[in-house]
Amino acid sequence: MKRIKGGLIVSCQALSTEPLCDPYIMSMMAYAAKEGGAVGIRANTTVDIEAIKKKVDLPIIGIIKKDYEGSDVYITPTEKEVEELVRTGVDIIAVDATKRMRPGNIIFEEFFKNIRSKYPNQLFMADTSCFEEGKKALELGCDLLGTTMCGYTEYTKGHSLPALDLIERYSKELRARVVAEGGIWVPEQLEAAYKSGAYTAVVGTVITRPRDITRRFVNALKTLDE
């Protein structure tokens, strides 16, 4: 935990629909991030995590993104994904900690009590969207609270990002270790997250997703023609 405090964690992920979806490419992204001074990596899928572990000696936050019919939860949604991540030896496992129903009509509280009991020594990060969720996750034994899902649930859509107000409340009211994640596009926003009380921070798209970055610039050009 001390290794990631006060530093930058870089999210190195590419979905199956993206050109850079390849474990080797993600491992090189992680290597480049380390060269740039990153203190940790957030990665998706066991194959990417294993490839990254061979390339860099940095703490890794691991997730498995998987869609299940009938549920909007897709970040490490079931115990099956948790078990797969535990087998990789990943340092921290991040799970969706929103109040949305999980696959099999399971609520977060039931899900997390089970995995906390099975893996008492594993560090877990709660990907939350609002204060209520963070408070519950901390009470249940989550080690880190992330603002990852703020703005992405139906009840938080339109929330300004990065979620500085949520970071501040988690830090001051709950005394939690807060992972600022989501909506950090420029260094000034990263600074603001830390001033709001972040323990550490994750930045992804603006560093490791060239297709999305390119689209952002192209869309800016389109407004010139309007």
What is each PLM-predicted segment?
Residues 70-85, 129-143, 176-180, 184-201:
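Catalytic cores of alpha/beta
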Residues 13-15, 64-68, 88-102, 144-157, ...:
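Glycine-rich phosphate-binding active-site loops on the catalytic face of alpha/beta enzymes
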Residues 166-180:
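Short, positively charged, low-complexity/disordered linker segments
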Residues 1-87, 118, 124, 132-140, ...:
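Conserved N-terminal beta1-alpha1 strand-loop-helix module at the mouth
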Residues 19-23, 42-61, 72-78, 97-115, ...:
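Active-site-adjacent beta->alpha loops and helix N-cap segments on the catalytic face
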Residues 31-37, 115-121, 172-176, 197-198:
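Short, surface-exposed connector motifs at secondary-structure boundaries
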Residues 57-58, 106, 119-122, 175-176, ...:
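Short acidic, glycine/proline-enriched helix-loop-strand junctions
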Residues 6-12, 41, 60-64, 93-95, ...:
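Hydrophobic faces of well-ordered beta-strands that scaffold small-molecule active sites
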